[in-house]
Structure formats: structure tokens, C-alpha cells
Amino acid sequence: MFSLLKYSVKINVNLDNGVYVFDNESATGKSRLYSLVKKYSAYGEPVAGYTFEDFCRGLDITAVLNPKKFALVVLDRLDMYSNRSILSLIEKSAHDCIILVDCKNDFQVNIDYDWCYINMTANAIEVS
């Protein structure tokens, strides 16, 4: 479970530590969640986000898959940059933080994960 309730758009994640994958339906709030996580991370909150653009810029994903530093990690478009090394790191980190995964295509990898669902309103995003 993780919540950030002090900002104008609240984030509430009703999940235990582990890897959770969103379905690939468009316009549900996943991109907004990613944007808010990046914004709140800049405010010093224990959240992080990583996307294909970060990968292309050469940013090291190990900086965000750090459960000692982050309670919630959002991995956007993971299917575009995942490899065995990244998936292994995700598996290790998932014991100590919540990792939410968005893919543009079906998520077909050999790691343990569950599905998650997002509900967005004007003032809140809830993931369960």
C-alpha cells in the first residue's frame, strides 16, 4: 500500500509490494500517473518513473529500481526496452517496493506479476 495525499492530485495504490501490469487500454490515466510520479519525485517523494525516453538518453534504470530509496516505481513502455538484466533487477526490487508496469503491447515475460487496474478522477488516481 502506498499513498500520496498532500497534493492537489492524490495517488493511492492499494497493492502490496510486487510487480503489477496495467492492461494496454488507452486513456485510462497511466500516462498521467507517470507524469505525476516524475513530478512528485522532484519534490523529494519516495516515487520514481522510467520510460523509453530515459532508456534512449542512456539513463541507468538501476537509479529508479532502488527499493531503499523508492516505495513506488512506474515503468512506462517497458516492452520497448526490457531485457533479461532489467527483468532480473525488477524481480529483485519487487520484494521491497511496488512496481507498476505499462506496456504498449502484451507483457509476455517470465517473471511473477499480477494485473492492476487504474481509476482516474480530476483530483485522484487510484490503482488496485
Role assignments for model-derived ranges:
Residues 39-50:
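Post-Walker A helix-loop "phosphate-sensing" segment adjacent to the P-loop in P-loop NTPases
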Residues 33-35:
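Post-Walker A alpha-helix
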Residues 26-30:
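Walker A (P-loop) phosphate-binding loop of P-loop NTPases
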Residues 64-85:
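Conserved P-loop NTPase "ATPase switch" module shared by AAA+ and STAND
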Residues 22:
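Hydrophobic anchor at the beta1->P-loop junction of P-loop NTPases
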Residues 12-17:
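Phosphate-binding P-loop
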Residues 1-11:
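N-terminal pre-Walker A segment at the start of P-loop NTPase domains
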